[in-house]
Amino acid sequence: MAGARSVGSLPVPNVQALAEICNDPDEHIPERYIRPEASSEEVINNYQGDMAIPIIDLKKLLCPQSSEEECVKLRSACQYWGFFLLINHGVPDEVIANLKRDIVDFFSQPLDTKKEYTQLPNSLEGYGQSFVFSEDQKLDWADMLYLHVHPSDSRDLRFWPTSPASFRQSIDAYSSETKSLALCLFEFMAKAVGAKPESLLDLFEEQPRGLRMAYYPPCRQADKVMGLSPHSDAGGLTLLLEINNVQGLQIKKDGKWFSIDAPNGALIANIGDTLEILSNGKFRSVEHRAVINPNKERISAALFHYPSENMVISPLPEFVKDGKVKYRSISYLDFMKQIFTQQLDGKNRVEVLKLDQ
């Protein structure tokens, strides 16, 4: 987001290049990438019924005959899971296909070509890694390209690849098509808990959005590394697109990790810390992580929706009908500075804002 331009991440080795070396049986994974916790915690892979991640159908939300029932499902998903699969979302297949093609082509290019878009000091935008602030810190097994996509005047085109030639156009089209989708979700989320539909809509409608495209190389010792450290997202809402249908996202619920396998064509939506605070805990952000496949690369694109950097985030009156405020207020700019100057650490940053009940 724009307000985090003054912070950045330390440069680290390119993981895609490192993976090519480490997949040689005679080579060892560098110690900074070894994560004992990657294989020590229970993971649920096959689940159903009440233990299955909710699926929300946008067509049913928009249909007067089924909207009320689907709103109940949406409320439950946001309250108990913090994640849901979104089907019939209305983003054109062609727009998604073009973005997928160009992201795959970008990460397939020679390293020297991708390095033309390397992050600069004190900047989050560009090609590299995020949340690296110490030379002793454990590292994630991933390379990323992060861009500010909205508003358009916040875009720094130095970091927008010109190869593939259609990449900029594909990103712009995807950003435009998902805007109305996100706003629709904000509207129905508020409606689902009896608040005014515009209560969330007004806070996010013309505010910053960022796109993080991530490449997770395969690793023959996948149980020893971590693609993305456990964390919760800082913003309001995240829409995740799986690019090549390789599973790797896991979310934490009731102390256990659940693997998420999205149906082809679905988007994965999740609640961010900001929305948890604004809703006074009626919605909750959830700790999640990315794990590595031993044989296949995984590629994803996460679109983050932020409020204004000038906003003070605190529970909205519409969500505090019982008079019990559960979170301290904090300026969003200060909140983001905390996040982008520390390594990822579960849900710690939102937990410290909770008031004793």
From Swiss-Prot:
This is 2-oxoglutarate-dependent dioxygenase 11. Gene3D superfamilies: B-lactam Antibiotic, Isopenicillin N Synthase, Chain. Expressed in shoots. 2-oxoglutarate binds at residue 298. Coiled coil: none annotated. The gene is 2ODD11. InterPro entries: DIOX_N, IPNS-like_FE2OG_OXY, IPNS-like_sf, Oxoglu/Fe-dep_dioxygenase_dom, Plant_2OG-oxidoreductases. The keyword Chloroplast does not apply. Belongs to the iron/ascorbate-dependent oxidoreductase family. Residues 207-307 form the Fe2OG dioxygenase domain. It catalyses: melatonin + 2-oxoglutarate + O2 = 2-hydroxymelatonin + succinate + CO2. Its cofactor is Fe(2+); L-ascorbate. GO terms for cellular component: cytoplasm. Fe cation binds at residues 231, 233, 288. Pfam families: 2OG-FeII_Oxy, DIOX_N. It comes from the Eukaryota. Keywords: Cytoplasm, Dioxygenase, Iron, Metal-binding, Oxidoreductase, Vitamin C. The lineage of its organism: Eukaryota, Viridiplantae, Streptophyta, Embryophyta, Tracheophyta.
